[in-house]
């Protein structure tokens, strides 16, 4: 059993993201000797994946209680968080006890948020069971829940005590969810690691399979990109903003679809939008925009969204968490692995970029 440990620093308590097959046995060492109780937060649809986590921790001597929550984005609601706070209180959960989050990105976001807010902060260990969770949501310490006004508007920076990425959980993932996670892998390639793009382009079909020839390398490279960025900028005061490539429009699409649209699918469209913005601003050429479309489409990700949605999307973008005052900020590229911030783009520029994404712009690069 080969285990890879990717260190994440930038805090007084650095931690490892552990990657491998059949590695749930790493959990007791991460929980440690001081904890007596372990709360295992998991989607109510993933009891079979939470069960071995609970069994390993019980065997190690901990008082374990599972806390099922709704699946997906429905879990990231203040009512769900309040219910978990109540159950932690009923269990006399103390500051030395530990919360373990098992599931996809929405579940690990929620588990981290509850850990950050209970008793002003208890340790969290995250066990992502989706590709999206492994390469993005579980790494970096950003936690949050949604409101009616937008996604992740209430949250905290609360780095986990450890992240365990057991690759054995991926083969049972629905294909659409796995492909959605690839959007974040590809994003890491565009903002920091061109080798990721080369690997996907060399064999797109293999990239869509958990047992693909380069699957583990793609996952580890994407995690390493995020680990490096968040180690340098935990609280998103500077460099960490680049991780939001594609997310400004992507989050707006998710809200427009009432969070029923896969995160990765929305981010895929958002990256093409950001690339079109960069092209229109004179930063990149049409060939790089076309490369975005080609790579994303080659693994089954969408690159277009409906034309009539722009007014609602524009209004949502204005409350994006990256906005400074009244100034909109978009992560764009000056080149592959050369991210930058485009601040204050005009409404006309935004509309023109969106026309290209909706497929009706006369100057959109033809990649069909």
Swiss-Prot record:
Q: Which residues bind NAD(+)?
A: 71-76, 105-109, 129-130, 142, 151
Q: Which Gene Ontology terms cover its molecular function?
A: 3-dehydroquinate synthase activity; metal ion binding; nucleotide binding
Q: Which gene encodes it?
A: aroB
Q: Which GO terms describe its biological process?
A: amino acid biosynthetic process; aromatic amino acid family biosynthetic process; chorismate biosynthetic process
Superkingdom to which the source organism belongs: Bacteria
Q: Which reaction does it catalyse?
A: 7-phospho-2-dehydro-3-deoxy-D-arabino-heptonate = 3-dehydroquinate + phosphate
Q: According to its UniProt record, where is this protein located?
A: Cytoplasm
Show the NCBIfam families listed in the entry.
aroB
- EC class of the enzyme, as a word: lyase
Cofactor(s) the record lists: Co(2+); Zn(2+); NAD(+)
UniProt organism field: Thermobifida fusca (strain YX)
Cofactor binding remark: Binds 1 divalent metal cation per subunit. Can use either Co(2+) or Zn(2+).
Which of this chain's residues are annotated to bind Zn(2+)?
Answer: 184, 247, 263
Q: What EC number(s) would the UniProt record show?
A: 4.2.3.4
Where does this protein act, in terms of pathway?
Metabolic intermediate biosynthesis; chorismate biosynthesis; chorismate from D-erythrose 4-phosphate and phosphoenolpyruvate: step 2/7
- Keywords noted in UniProt: Amino-acid biosynthesis, Aromatic amino acid biosynthesis, Cobalt, Cytoplasm, Lyase, Metal-binding, NAD, Nucleotide-binding, Zinc
This chain belongs to the protein called 3-dehydroquinate synthase
Relate the protein's function as given in its record: Catalyzes the conversion of 3-deoxy-D-arabino-heptulosonate 7-phosphate (DAHP) to dehydroquinate (DHQ).
Family, as annotated: Belongs to the sugar phosphate cyclases superfamily. Dehydroquinate synthase family.
